[in-house]
């Protein structure tokens, strides 16, 4: 029951955020005359894009258990970490750590800039996580995540 209330609360927060003046119009975030460009087709199943404070975009290749990043300055993709616990959704906290939903063993991870990982939790409300999927971190470092039953 507490899990249902947590999910409803999260959805309510998401709805409030999406209807607030903080949401950008797509015309404001997509540069005029922008062109879609294929950066790479070497991945199996990508997930969880998140931008670091430098503008690099990190993403997971979940079946291959790796995290990569696209360096916006060089336009090259580099491997950041392998053996990620089959990371899915990602988000950067205010200290520059990459948080991941690592669903292989139902865990939420924190990975520092050097690629050193720490398991933050494997449970919520006394129950083991099923398969964390996506997450978001608020300005007070509160972590919100989805944990669906597949």
Sequence positions of predicted segments:
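Bacterial N-terminal signal peptides
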Residues: 6-17
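Sequence-structural signature of mature extracellular/luminal beta-sheet repeat domains
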Residues: 18-150
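Positively charged n-region of N-terminal signal peptides that target proteins for export
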Residues: 1-5
């Amino acid at each position: 029951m507490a899990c249902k209330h947590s999910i409803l609360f999260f959805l309510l927060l998401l709805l409030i955020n999406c209807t607030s003046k903080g949401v950008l119009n797509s015309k404001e975030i997509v540069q005029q005359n922008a062109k879609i460009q294929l950066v790479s087709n070497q991945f199996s199943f990508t997930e969880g894009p998140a931008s670091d404070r430098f503008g690099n975009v990190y993403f997971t290749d979940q079946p291959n258990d790796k995290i990569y990043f696209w360096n916006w300055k060089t336009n090259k993709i580099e491997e950041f970490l392998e053996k990620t616990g089959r990371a899915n959704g990602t988000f950067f906290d205010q200290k520059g750590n990459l948080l991941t939903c690592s669903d292989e063993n139902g865990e939420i991870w924190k990975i520092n800039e050097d690629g050193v990982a720490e398991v933050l939790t494997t449970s919520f409300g006394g129950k083991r996580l099923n398969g964390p999927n996506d997450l978001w971190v608020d300005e007070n470092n509160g972590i919100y995540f989805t944990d669906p039953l597949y």
